[in-house]
C-alpha cells in the first residue's frame, strides 16, 4: 500500500476520552474512530490488524477440525424462549421487533442458534462429532462501555460449539479447543493464562478462561506462587484453616446497642473479627437465602447464585424482607432462629468455635455460637479468597491480580440440547441429547490486549504475526527521483516475496513519517535517503537500533526476521 493513497489520520495528542493504552493508541494510530458510546468504526489499518488476528484463529480452528459457517446476527425470540433465556438474559440484550411485531434480538451469544442447527441437521451418531464455529459481530448493551473496544456494545467474537455423542467425546473436543487456544494466543504474541472459571449465564459444568494480566482488567485472578493453580475470583478456593479446638461454651446474649458493623462489635466485645460471623440476606428468584461467613470475609455472590440454582442475577433483600426474616434492624441478624428458605454456611464457619453473631434482636448479639449445636445449613464455599491465603492444591501463597478475559471454554453438557429437545439417534437406536461444548474468543478484545502488552512511549509495537503491515519503506525526500525510484523498487521486491509493505511516498517531513511508522507499530522500517549514493539504506526494527545495510540485502534481512519468528512468508 502506498501511503499517498491510504486513508490514514494519526493523532499527536491523546484523546480525552481514552483511559487505557490500547484505546489511546488505537485512536492515535488511526485504527478506530468512535461512532457512539461503545460503538466504533474500524478504519483500514484497524481492520487489517483485526483480520490478522482472525486469520490466526481461523487457521488453528480449522487445524483442530472445526468447520466455519456464519449464523444470522438477528435471532427470533422463540429460540431464546425455548432455552429459557429470553427473560433471564437481562438488559444487556438488544431486543427489536419487526413490522409484524415479532420479537427478535441482536445476538449477544449464539448457543440457541447452533443448537437449533444441530437439531435440524444432525440425525445420527454416525455424523458425530461435529464442531462448528463462526467469526461474527455480537451486540451487548453494556451498562457502562469503556476502554475502547475492550468493553464495547458491538464487538467481533469467535464462537464455536462442539456436538458429541457422549462425555468422553466432549472431553476430547474440549481438550482440542484448549490446545488450539494456547496456540492461538501464543501466535498472537499474547501472554494469556488459563484459569478455572465460573460458567455464568451460559451454564454448563467445567469452565476455563484465558486471561491476560491488566491493571484495568474487570476480573480478579488468583494465582499460586508455588504451583500452576490459577482461577477467577468467582471460582477460586483456598486451603481451609485447621479446625478450632475449644470447649463449647453456653450461648450468651449481650447488649450491643450502637454496634451494627463487624468492626464495631469486635471493638465493643474486645475480640478479633475472625471470631465473628456475619449474615447476608439475598432474594434469589423470590426465595430468601441467608449466607453466613466469617466476619472478616467477603461473600462471593457468584458462588451463592450457583449454590442457590439462581436463574439470573441475585439481589440483596429489601428492608421489608429483611425485617420479616430477622425481626431486627440492620446489623443484628444471625443464624439462630432466622426465617429463610435456604441457609448457606461457609465451610470456614463450620470449623469455628464460640463465635459471635447477631441475635436477630435489635441492639443485641450472641456469644459462643457453634455450628451444629446451635444452627445448621448447607456447608460450602461461599466467600472470596484473599491475598496471602494458602493454595488449596499445594499450600503455597495465593496472590491476586486484575485480568481481562480474552477466551473462555465451557463443557455445556446437555443444558441446551435438553431444553431445546435437540437429539440424535444413538448407537442403541434410541434418541439422546447432544453433549455440547462452547468455546469463545473475543477477537477485538484480543487485538486490544495485544496492544496493551506490546507498546512503548512512541506507540504500538506489533508482534510480526499480527502487524497490519510488516515493513514501512520511507522515501525521505519525495522530490528526489532516485530516492523514490529505489524506495519503490524495494517496496515492489518485498511484496513479491510475500511481505506486506507500506511505501511512505507522502510529501511530508521525514520526522512525520518516522513518527507515524512508530505509532502504527510497523515492525520494520527501511529508510531510503542520502546513503543511496553508496548503495545503502537504513534498516531498523521497531524496538531496535538503526543499522546501515546494502540495498541488495534488504529482502534477505527482512526474510531473516520472519525466520527468527518462525513465520512463513505468504
UniProtKB/Swiss-Prot annotation:
<keyword id="KW-0547">Nucleotide-binding</keyword>
<comment type="similarity">
    <text>Belongs to the class-II aminoacyl-tRNA synthetase family. ProS type 1 subfamily.</text>
</comment>
<keyword id="KW-0067">ATP-binding</keyword>
<keyword id="KW-0648">Protein biosynthesis</keyword>
<dbReference type="InterPro" id="IPR006195">
    <property type="entry name" value="aa-tRNA-synth_II"/>
</dbReference>
<keyword id="KW-0436">Ligase</keyword>
<dbReference type="GO" id="GO:0004827">
    <property type="term" value="F:proline-tRNA ligase activity"/>
</dbReference>
<dbReference type="GO" id="GO:0002161">
    <property type="term" value="F:aminoacyl-tRNA deacylase activity"/>
</dbReference>
<keyword id="KW-0963">Cytoplasm</keyword>
<dbReference type="InterPro" id="IPR050062">
    <property type="entry name" value="Pro-tRNA_synthetase"/>
</dbReference>
<dbReference type="InterPro" id="IPR023717">
    <property type="entry name" value="Pro-tRNA-Synthase_IIa_type1"/>
</dbReference>
<dbReference type="GO" id="GO:0140096">
    <property type="term" value="F:catalytic activity, acting on a protein"/>
</dbReference>
<dbReference type="GO" id="GO:0005829">
    <property type="term" value="C:cytosol"/>
</dbReference>
<comment type="function">
    <text>Catalyzes the attachment of proline to tRNA(Pro) in a two-step reaction: proline is first activated by ATP to form Pro-AMP and then transferred to the acceptor end of tRNA(Pro). As ProRS can inadvertently accommodate and process non-cognate amino acids such as alanine and cysteine, to avoid such errors it has two additional distinct editing activities against alanine. One activity is designated as 'pretransfer' editing and involves the tRNA(Pro)-independent hydrolysis of activated Ala-AMP.</text>
</comment>
<dbReference type="GO" id="GO:0005524">
    <property type="term" value="F:ATP binding"/>
</dbReference>
<dbReference type="InterPro" id="IPR002316">
    <property type="entry name" value="Pro-tRNA-ligase_IIa"/>
</dbReference>
<dbReference type="InterPro" id="IPR033730">
    <property type="entry name" value="ProRS_core_prok"/>
</dbReference>
<dbReference type="GO" id="GO:0006433">
    <property type="term" value="P:prolyl-tRNA aminoacylation"/>
</dbReference>
<dbReference type="InterPro" id="IPR036621">
    <property type="entry name" value="Anticodon-bd_dom_sf"/>
</dbReference>
<dbReference type="GO" id="GO:0016740">
    <property type="term" value="F:transferase activity"/>
</dbReference>
<dbReference type="Pfam" id="PF00587">
    <property type="entry name" value="tRNA-synt_2b"/>
</dbReference>
<dbReference type="InterPro" id="IPR004500">
    <property type="entry name" value="Pro-tRNA-synth_IIa_bac-type"/>
</dbReference>
<dbReference type="InterPro" id="IPR002314">
    <property type="entry name" value="aa-tRNA-synt_IIb"/>
</dbReference>
<dbReference type="InterPro" id="IPR004154">
    <property type="entry name" value="Anticodon-bd"/>
</dbReference>
<dbReference type="InterPro" id="IPR045864">
    <property type="entry name" value="aa-tRNA-synth_II/BPL/LPL"/>
</dbReference>
<dbReference type="InterPro" id="IPR007214">
    <property type="entry name" value="YbaK/aa-tRNA-synth-assoc-dom"/>
</dbReference>
<dbReference type="InterPro" id="IPR044140">
    <property type="entry name" value="ProRS_anticodon_short"/>
</dbReference>
<protein>
    <recommendedName>
        <fullName>Proline--tRNA ligase</fullName>
        <ecNumber>6.1.1.15</ecNumber>
    </recommendedName>
</protein>
<keyword id="KW-0030">Aminoacyl-tRNA synthetase</keyword>
<dbReference type="Pfam" id="PF03129">
    <property type="entry name" value="HGTP_anticodon"/>
</dbReference>
<comment type="subunit">
    <text>Homodimer.</text>
</comment>
<dbReference type="Pfam" id="PF04073">
    <property type="entry name" value="tRNA_edit"/>
</dbReference>
<dbReference type="InterPro" id="IPR036754">
    <property type="entry name" value="YbaK/aa-tRNA-synt-asso_dom_sf"/>
</dbReference>
